[in-house]
Amino acid sequence: MSASDPQEFSGKRVLVTGGTEGAGKAIADRFLKGGATVAITARSAPAEGTPAHYIQADLSTSEGTAHVIREILGRFKGVDIIVHNVGGSSAPTGGFITVTDPLWQQAMDENLYPAVRLDRGLLPSMIEHGSGVIVHISSIQRTLPLYDSTMAYAAAKAALTNYSKALSNEVSPKGIRVLTVSPGFIETDAATRMIQRMADGDKIDYSAARQKLMDMLGGIPLGRPNRPEEVAELVAFAASDRATAITGTEIVIDGGTVPIV
């Protein structure tokens, strides 16, 4: 494997969904550093001065994904790399009984359907050019589901991972690599908000809720959560020409959380 070229993404058009904060921002910044033209999507605008092209959209809706597809095809004439990072959970604590039908639907709308809809709209141009990379950001919760706060999220990520594998089987022979990156606990603002919800629901302090989450995951042998920049570096490698034989698989970055090999 050759070393990373500082401008390895020069000339590449990259779309990062959920790219204004957390791991998504770190991923977008990494591609920008590598010389790519980067478009990011989110409901809220990024910090002023970002060099990425911002497309405001709610990807949990079909209208939002249709808008992004029009913008990408119209402004950039297609895309070379898609990183489906958007997703998350806003379900309350309390376990299974608290997850209503609307919350189950919301989990799918936020964690599965954006990827399906965007792939449907943007893959044809990739296939026409005979090349491209699609990275779906899943989660280790697809195999280590937690019942408190993220049950529906975990199920949606399991669906995303299986969808990604099926899609790779179809389009890899056409020159399109499709793979999944599944992080464990990432120390982001969104994770902080989720931990605070757990703390409020259990009437404990933040540090106790953070430790509870780590314990629920079975512990992190590395001793700490992932950093957004570490996830971004893995995604950049997976999308680069250093990984041209990697498709149809899941790459886990979790500090050793998953207890099996």
Where on the chain are the PLM-derived regions?
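Catalytic loop of short-chain dehydrogenase/reductase
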Residues: V135-A159, S164-P173, F185-I186
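Short, small/polar-rich loop/turn modules that mediate ligand/substrate recognition or access, typified
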Residues: S172, R177, I246-G248
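Short C-terminal tail/terminal secondary-structure segment
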Residues: S2-P6, T93, R224, V235-A236, ...
